[in-house]
UniProtKB/Swiss-Prot annotation:
The gene is end3. Its main location: membrane. Keywords: Actin-binding, Calcium, Cell membrane, Coiled coil, Cytoplasm, Cytoskeleton, Endocytosis, Endosome, Membrane, Metal-binding, Repeat. Component of the PAN1 actin cytoskeleton-regulatory complex. InterPro entries: EF-hand-dom_pair, EF_Hand_1_Ca_BS, EF_hand_dom, EH_dom, End3. Residues 286-400 form a coiled coil. The keyword Cell membrane applies. It comes from the Eukaryota. This is Actin cytoskeleton-regulatory complex protein end3. One of its GO terms (molecular function) is actin binding. Residues 42-77 form the EF-hand domain. It is a peripheral membrane protein. It comes from Sclerotinia sclerotiorum (strain ATCC 18683 / 1980 / Ss-1) (White mold). Belongs to the END3 family.
């Protein structure tokens, strides 16, 4: 499995951008997202493909999770992680809450993959094959009693059933993913009965099944309405993505699953992320688009100057005229000045301390580019005059 992930610091940074663009809304339209996406200076066709990949639910808008996906894809492209937009969304970038949509899409296009699961303990001694989905009347009655004693006002279950069962956490996670592919915080009665049946059979020595009969899965997903308004208000952006601030535990995957499982059941931390109004443009990061683009423009300017010098030297037969040499010195001095400004911006020195923006430097580079173009035109006109003078001299010699 890939070690890549969207870090908590990235999520908080993306939230600042999302909150400023959405004006308190939950989704971004194409018009709202266009300014920040086009600021990357990627081609329009690339941005269109990134939008298609990020818009997992195909509703024509981006919610916060989808916006995070789009931003990470853009940053990876700008910084050379990808040569082009990937044909499919990498598994590590798929939002957990939308994994079922991606799986359905891949199934329709012939690229179906399984949901992320902890590996089955196939070598565990004593486990048997032959799991039977049939519930005996006595077992079903027992499951219904547990359900009735723990359901909430809407008839859903949101508590940790596995705490009283002698079942490994990895198997609990496999069973939960199996009956709850949409990663909802609560499950219905039918799904609860199936969940208890799977865990009961695992306790009796049967392996967790890998699939659910289609008819049974349909009953899990029928009439699923999200009443948990607090889930949208309380959960922080980092919590939505399963980020826990880098905490490590000695129990490895089981502990990680426990945290994810509690979060899915709505029993996670109560803290929430609240935008503090931080100016995102002042954030120091090596992945900042303006900085990357400025370095690229400086490299293009250097290449252009070298090209002009080579062309001038070729035309003059290796001789250096006073005017081109002066132009070169001026351009070199200007280039050194721009390099010093870039170093100051990267290190936080110079004008960057009082709020000088990379946008201003980019504007100055555009001005320099225009000056270079003007000097090239002037050089060509002077060369043309020189050629005309040479031609007049030759004509005068011939006439004599």
């Amino acid at each position: 499995m890939s070690n890549k992930r969207i870090e908590q610091s990235e999520i908080e940074k993306y939230w600042e951008i999302f909150a400023s663009l959405s004006n308190g809304g939950t989704h971004l339209t194409g018009a709202q997202a266009a300014p920040v996406l086009k600021n990357s200076q990627l081609r329009d066709d690339q941005l269109e493909r990134i939008w298609d990949l990020a818009d997992v639910d195909n509703d024509g808008n981006l919610d916060f999770e989808e916006f995070c996906v789009a931003m990470r894809l853009i940053f990876d492209l700008v910084n050379g992680e990808y040569a082009d937009v990937p044909p499919a969304l990498p598994d590590w970038l798929v939002p957990e809450s939308k994994a079922h949509l991606v799986q359905a899409s891949r199934a329709l296009t012939g690229r179906q993959v399984q949901f992320e699961r902890v590996e089955d303990d196939d070598d565990t001694p004593g486990l048997k094959d032959g799991f039977d989905w049939y519930m005996s009347p006595s077992d079903k009655s027992k499951y219904e009693e547990i359900y009735a004693a723990n359901r909430d006002g809407r008839g859903d279950i949101t508590y940790t059933l596995y705490s009283s069962l002698d079942v490994p956490d990895t198997d609990v996670r496999s069973a939960w993913n199996l009956i709850n592919p949409s990663a909802a915080p609560a499950i219905s009665k039918d799904a609860t009965l199936a969940f208890l049946h799977i865990l009961n059979n695992r306790h009796e020595g049967y392996r967790i099944p890998r699939t659910v009969p289609p008819s049974l899965r349909a009953s899990f997903e029928r009439n699923q309405i999200d009443y948990q308004l607090d889930n949208q208000r309380v959960a922080s952006p980092a919590q939505k993505w399963g980020v826990t601030g880098g905490e490590e535990t000695s129990t490895g995957r089981k502990a990680k699953f426990g945290e994810t499982y509690m979060s899915r059941l709505g029993l996670g931390g109560k803290s929430s992320y609240r935008p503090a109004g931080t100016d995102f443009s002042g954030t120091k990061t090596t992945e900042d688009w303006e900085e990357v683009r400025l370095k690229k423009q400086l490299a293009e300017l250097e290449a252009k100057i070298e090209k002009v010098e080579a062309a001038a030297a070729a035309r003059s037969g290796g001789r250096r005229d006073t005017k081109p040499a002066l132009v070169k010195r001026e351009l070199e001095q200007l280039l050194d000045y721009k390099r010093r400004e870039l170093r100051d911006l990267e290190s936080g020195e110079g004008r960057s301390k009082v709020g000088a923006s990379l946008k201003g430097v980019a504007d100055e580079i555009a001005t320099v580019r225009e000056q270079v173009d003007g000097l090239e035109a002037h050089l060509r006109s002077r060369e043309q005059v020189l050629e005309e003078l040479k031609q007049e001299i030759e004509n005068e010699k011939i006439s004599r």
